[in-house]
């Protein structure tokens, strides 16, 4: 019953219903997409798609809705032992409503204790599956598709959805357990994909026509990890602000930001309102470098602002409009990153124009406030990225920002990192990859994503890469959303068009978000280290992406729209008209043409064989 669509769907459903009444064997193995299964060639898909029932959807292909052939509660009988190991179980299978959409929500756990949730629409399933990534060190399940602002398929509840907590937790202690560490590194995501596909087959009587992955932050790492390790799991992968260089990201990067903003007394050197002072100076100095004064830096690499230019005079008694010497030193470290013998230890640190985003990450509102970067770094350093456990009393003052430490990261690099520049198997399978990153992201440097894009080009060739990969950079946008720049974006629709009809994406319009809620897409869990799926009867965890409106370009009443183009192209102002209107921009050439700077860990981006544990 593969790929039945259009007019045939109702007949298939009827036949499958009879099979259920007669007693379907839910414990039989389902053929998840493997290398051999990948021979579902594009021509086969196109033939099937041609018979699809057309609807009012704006996506490239409109697939006929398929109704369930089994009761939701029947899915409790599905055996997942072959997928998740002995002890894997389904804890609940029941219908529940969210935003007027009724889902069959199925939850459970794998042997590693990783929890998962699959949600299948009772009506209007248009034969697509989307798995959503999990942010931070995970430990919770929140199925919230991001980069989907304007996607009819997402907002109408047409996707079967799933996610996993990856057996993780924000304190990182799960890393001491090998099974949970492996589940977090890669395995739980793959097992969830296999589980969802098996449940979809059992519930609807047919497989999903297309499968997609959509994640940001660690979810972005998970996305690229799937392309590397399991190239046939998904037809299309959207990876936002990917924490793909995990071992560096959560040690050298966050660790450096923490120690650089901590004085000898353990207090903060720079606080939020002082970062705001710096931001104003940066924008004043560099805003016009991209050809338009709009409060945004289209490519921060053009900016070379020196914080010392607004340093207070030695005899100043009022520093309300200038920076202290200590602040200048700390801010310069934020931008430059750590070095050993004059050589950089990271790809790139904070970008000019990101200053307002520092608050809550490595800058606090007060001189005695905690900063997230400290906890982030310690969780990874103590429990995940090194083979040897450094002990309970380990602090960031014990971390050596040196080349020798990079050598210690190599052991778990092929387990945790997702930066192999060989995606040839994913390419051969017909997969499509969209990378995206906010230029003002304080958590993960967009330069890491650029460096990965460049590594792919170098290893695979520009022509081959152009067949299946695109990178979008969003000016003024923070981590997975929000910011001074327009951050609402729909990359789902272009991905569907690319995968299902072969139309490669080009210009994508962004806008200021209209909603006012907090986004959980790609974000860290607030607390907790426990694993396991939602308990029986747990509330449905489907939420559309929403973003805070505290920081957007223009006034609160102003809607800003702006196109973004595949890197290295940028949106170029036409020279006339409202700078807040996308219609007044066109595709422009690269503003910055240098490749990523040389740094001591650049060989991590070379092709490598991922390890299992």
In which residue ranges do the predicted regions lie?
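Fungal secretory targeting signals
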Residues: 1-29, 34-37
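Catalytic-loop region of hydrolases
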Residues: 23-27, 33-35, 40-128, 132, ...
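Cap/lid segment of the alpha/beta-hydrolase catalytic domain
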Residues: 135-205, 251-252, 259, 393-407, ...
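Alpha/beta-hydrolase fold nucleophile elbow
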Residues: 206-217
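Glycine-rich nucleophile elbow surrounding the catalytic serine of serine-hydrolase chemistry
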Residues: 215-225
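A catalytic-pocket lid/entrance helix-loop region that shapes and gates access to the active site
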Residues: 225-227, 232-339, 473, 487, ...
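Short beta-strand/loop motif that positions the catalytic acidic residue
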Residues: 435-437
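Histidine-bearing beta->alpha loop at or near hydrolase active sites
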Residues: 468-482, 514-518
